[in-house]
């Protein structure tokens, strides 16, 4: 994945300040979470070349901040016991400072609730969005505005050529 961040030079001309891979990633063995850009609610300084995504990966943004990230989930292998899935999800959420967001995991081990608005575009694969009372199956290029609800993402089928369809 290539990430291009723009800004301004000392003369006020637009330039590329970062051209390369995401600054940080985590969980690549099960798909991965890749940090693209973060804001913390402070005024924007477009002459600053600091990589705002090069910090510890935490699920939720700081107050008045934002997070722009790419994530991928792989299908859950069949036959994995519920307890193993619960333990793996608990460890994964702990690693990104989000254990406290797992308020009700009775429907799925990855269920979590944040006080954020999340914008999701499914690029490839076959994914279900699980909610407390409903489930919706997503196809490539479906979009979701997730508004602070208890939810989980479940990959039903991953295909590397789904984006080409």
What kind of feature is each model-predicted range?
Residues 1-56:
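N-terminal leader/capping segments at the start of a protein or of a new domain
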Residues 13, 126, 150-152:
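Structural motif
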Residues 26-28, 58-62, 80-85, 108-114, ...:
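Short histidine-centered beta-strand/loop micro-motifs
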Residues 69-114, 148:
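Conserved short histidine dyad/triad with adjacent acidic residue
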Residues 108, 112-139:
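A short beta-strand-loop-beta hairpin characteristic of the jelly-roll/cupin
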Residues 131, 138-151:
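Conserved metal-binding segment of the jelly-roll/cupin
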Residues 158-165:
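Conserved small/polar residues in nucleotide/adenosyl-binding loops
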